[in-house]
Amino acid sequence: MAEFQGYLELDRSWKPDLLYPLIFREYIYAFAHDHGLNRSNLLENVGYNNKSSLLIVKRLISRMYQQNHFISSANDSNQNQLFGYNKNLYSQMISEGFAVIVEIPFSLRLVSCLKGTEIVKYYNLRSIHSIFPFLEDKFSHLNYVSDVLIPYPIHLEILVQTLRYWVKDASSLHLLRFFLHDYYNWNSFIIPNKYISIFSKSNPRLFLFLYNSHVFEYESILLFLRNQSSHLRLTSSGGFFERIYFYGKIKHPVEEVFANDFPTSLWFFEDFFMHYVRYQGKSILTSKDTPLFMNKWRYYLVLLWQCHFSVWSQPGRMYINQLCKHSLSFLGYLSNMQINLSVVRSQMLENSFLMDNAMKKIDTLVPISPLIGSLAKMRFCNVLGHPVSKSTWADSSDFDIIDRFAYICRNLFHYYSGSSKKNSLYRVKYILRLSCIKTLARKHKSTVRTFLKRLGSKLLEEFFTEEEEVLSLIFPRTYSALRSSYKGRIWYLDIFCINDLVNHK
C-alpha cells in the first residue's frame, strides 16, 4: 500500500472518492503485472512478450478514451467484441487493474485503523495454526457445534450492492457490472459453477476481493449481534432489523417466522455464549447452551441469507451435533472430543470416598483417506494408496525430482505437526518416497530393485528429514525438554496459506 500511496500523492487529479480515473493510469497496470497475477495468460498466451507490455498498456488506454468500445449488446453476446480482436487480452488487463484499484478504499481504511498500533503483535494470528490452540482452549467447555458453509450469492447484483457501501464512485460500480456481464450471462439469475471456476482462474484477485467483501458483509452483521448482545432486551425486533439494513425486505418474515421468538424484546440472545471460527467458505458455530439456542441461530442465519443476500439455503443442511459424539473436519484436520475418566480418592476426616473426574480434551487427527485421495489426484499413487511413478517429472534432473518430493513431504509433516497420532503421516511419507524412487527408476529405464541396489537406500534420507530432527537442529539445547513436555504436538505460526505447502517454488 505504501507504493500506491506514493503514486496517489503525485497524482493530484485523483480524489479519494473517485476511483474511475485511476483506470487510465499506466502505473496501475504495472502494479497488477508486478504482482504476478495471470502473467502467462496476460502476455504469453496471446503472442506478446514482456518488452512490448508498455505499448499494450498505452494502446489500451488510448482505446478506452473511445467510449463507443464500451457499448455492448446484452441481447447478442457474439456482437459484444470488447476492443476488437484483442477482447480477451484487454478485458483481462482492465479487470486486473480494476482489482488493484477497488482495493484502495479498503487499504486506506485499514492503514488508518492500524496507525499507532503494534502490528507485529498480531502477526502470529495470521497463521492457520493459530486457530487450533483457540479450539483446544475453548471447545473443551462447549457442548454443541454446527458446520456452516457460507453460500455464495446467486445474483451478481448482490456483490455490486455490497460494494456500494464502501465504494462511492458510481462509475466504478458500473465498470464492475460490465466485467461481470462480460464473464457471465447477465440475463441468467443463477451462476453455473463452471462460470465461477472460469472467473476465479482468469482473475483470482478480483474474484477473491468480491468474495471477501461478501463474507465481510455477512460477518459484520454477526459482529454487530455479538457486540450488542447485552442490549438486545431493550430493542424491539423492528428497530433491531432496521439497524442492519434489511428491515424492508424481511418485514413480513419477521412477523411470521419470529412471532413466537421475538414478542417485544429479543430474549433469544440471553446468556450469549457463542464462538465463531471461519476459514475461506467454511465456518463453525459452537455454544455451551441448549440445542434450542443453536436451532434458533440456525433459522436466523437462513433468514439472513435469504432476505439480505437473496441466497436460498435450507435449515436442514446445517447440522447441529454434540461435540462429544461428533468429529469435526476443519482445515485438513479431524478433531473430536475425548473424555478421559480418572478416579480420585478423597478423604475428609475419617471418611474416604472415590470421585470420578472427567477431563475433556480436543484430539486432532490426520484424515488418511482424504490425503490419499489428494495424492491419487496428483498421480503419486492410485486410489488404493499404492505408489506410482510421476511421469510428468521424469524429464527433470535427479536432484530436482528428489527436491520436489522432499518439499511436499516436509511441508505435510510441518502442517500436520499438531496431530496427536502421526501413523497416517508415515504412510504418506512411504507413498511419496516410493513414488520418488519409481520416478527416478523410470527416468533411468530401470526397475526399482535394480535402482536401489545400485545407488543404495540411503539416497533419499537427507531429503526426507523428519520434523523432530529439524527441531533438534534448530533448538539443540531446549528440544529434549520441549519434546518431553509437549509430546510432539507443535502448532506453527508461520503457515499463512495451505496452497504454499504443495506449490514448489
Swiss-Prot record:
It comes from the Eukaryota. One of its GO terms (cellular component) is chloroplast. Coiled coil: none annotated. The keyword Transmembrane helix does not apply. GO terms for molecular function: RNA binding. Its main location: plastid. Keywords: Chloroplast, mRNA processing, Plastid, RNA-binding, tRNA processing. InterPro entries: Domain_X, Maturase_MatK, Maturase_MatK_N. The keyword Transferase does not apply. GO terms for biological process: mRNA processing; RNA splicing; tRNA processing. It is found in: Plastid, Chloroplast. Belongs to the intron maturase 2 family. MatK subfamily. Usually encoded in the trnK tRNA gene intron. Probably assists in splicing its own and other chloroplast group II introns. This is Maturase K. It comes from Ficus carica.
